[in-house]
């Protein structure tokens, strides 16, 4: 899903969502009593100081925060339609400019442990559900 967004000429949102839905429906069919949690995609930061714009374009492909917001909205809608629980971790990782906080990221896409700690904090209420 997320990795496919990095390959600009291969990425099609419709295909991503279709595959995502298919996987969720297969899980529901095979494990009907299982509660499914669906988590948002993480934001990115394409504006880190010293980043070469051409390298960023090549590395990130179609993975922009605008695209991620739209995909997350579709994932949330799909989760609701399929009676899954959607967990938004996108917003808690953003800086004031709407990018993944620089202190959470290695190169704008992958996170350090402190970024994952924020995600874990957001997930804890769901992990502690009975």
List each language-model region with its residue ranges.
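Short, small-residue-biased leader/transition segments that mark boundaries at the very start
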Residues: 1-7
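Acidic/histidine-rich helix-loop elements
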Residues: 9-11, 108
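A short helix->loop->beta-strand "cap" motif at the edges of active sites that frequently abuts
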Residues: 31-35
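Catalytic His-Asp segment of secreted/periplasmic serine-dependent ester chemistry enzymes
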Residues: 44-130
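Generic structural signal for well-ordered alpha-helices
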Residues: 20-25, 72
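N-terminal cationic-hydrophobic initiation segments that often serve targeting/anchoring roles
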Residues: 24-29, 79
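Charged helix-capping and loop-helix junction motifs
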Residues: 12-21
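Structural beta-sheet core signal
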Residues: 38-40
């Amino acid at each position: 899903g997320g990795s496919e967004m990095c390959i600009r000429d291969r990425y099609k949102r419709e295909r991503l969502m279709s595959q995502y839905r298919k996987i969720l429906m297969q899980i529901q069919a095979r494990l009907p009593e299982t509660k499914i949690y669906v988590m948002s995609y993480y934001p990115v930061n394409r504006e880190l100081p010293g980043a070469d714009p051409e390298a960023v374009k090549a590395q990130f492909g179609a993975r922009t925060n605008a695209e991620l917001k739209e995909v997350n909205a579709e994932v949330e809608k799909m989760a609701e339609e399929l009676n899954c629980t959607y967990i938004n971790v996108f917003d808690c990782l953003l800086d004031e400019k709407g990018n993944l906080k620089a202190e959470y990221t290695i190169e704008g896409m992958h996170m350090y442990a402190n970024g994952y700690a924020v995600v874990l904090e957001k997930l804890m209420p769901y992990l502690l559900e009975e």
